[in-house]
């Protein structure tokens, strides 16, 4: 099959494509991209379910750890203010985990941007392909209308002027037949006219979904960043209420991180299967949606020497007919104008129409060549399966770092806030200290009584 320009599956695609797949009954499933088949759908759902399994194991581990911490902690002697051994290690482990989470957030922002760039490249390729197809339809319609107008007006007028000379009328009628033949052949070149599938609509739908996906990830990243920063602030200020609130928020973000991880993993595996051999699926799907012949679709999607141009015969016949019209008009101008001066005006108008038609014809030849649309196809593949897939892998790394960091923080935070001094300890200050809040209050009352 013809490879689009720059079409090279990456090492990540090969690695993900080689991963084993199974359905809900744990039976092996082929790695070919077949989203319409139930077994393949179950295989992707099973990949996503692995993240749910990881979430369940994380919650069980955190629950067991916290229960052991609460139930098996030795009682502190009354009035003891000596910090328990290992308290500093617990706090620092929590801080390191949160800093690792911040690094993961940076990776997540980069991955989100890469994914958005890849989807934008896909949308741009679809818009460019839509422009090419619209230009073909417009040129065909304009040329056919111009030829029809010439047949109805100039050629009819010319036949009326040349009526005394039957051989000249026969030549004019020959030009009419050739013009009608050209119009008929050109109408068959607008292969996308009336097709229900619109690349413009697909691009708009893709952009619409991508906007909400990008926004959702930005909100998730910002939420985790705020949780990490406020947790660090609570640890620095030894604020129990802030740390408790951030612990609850960390649990929420942990669930969201595992959920996004499952979605990213399933999408990455599906994209790798698609990108390993995209041509058969794209050909079949486009043929189902458009109803176009496989010859036309194979010519544009494969674009190699093994597939001939399905419009070559129409283009050849149109070019020959235009050449015949040109020679007939030259003969009429040479024979008829000296005898019928009034024939010069319709002949000049016909020559002008012929020149415009030939110009449009050469543009159609260039637009109908497979290079342009095949290049758009390659750009769409590179955007979706290189940039977008790379971004998904970075988002997957972010979710993994986030889940690990938050799980560590959830285990460490309860032990950290247990080491915070109680609020009563702040009242145990020297009465002679001028910065003592109680002493400052008595000083203000003394000044007001003077």
Swiss-Prot record:
Transmembrane portions of the chain: 44-64, 89-109, 215-235, 241-261, 391-411
Reaction it catalyzes: chloride(in) = chloride(out); L-glutamate(out) = L-glutamate(in)
Entry keyword annotation includes Disulfide bond: yes
Disulfide topology: 303-370
InterPro entries from the UniProt entry: Tweety (IPR006990)
Site (Essential for the formation of the channel-pore): 165
UniProt-annotated glycosylation sites, renumbered to this chain: 130, 284, 355
Superkingdom of the source species: Eukaryota
CDD domains membership: Tweety_N
GO biological process, one term: L-glutamate transmembrane transport
Topology Cytoplasmic: residue spans: 65-88, 236-240, 412-450
Family: Belongs to the tweety family.
The name this protein goes by in its record: Protein tweety homolog 1
Originating species: Macaca fascicularis (Crab-eating macaque)
Gene name as annotated: TTYH1
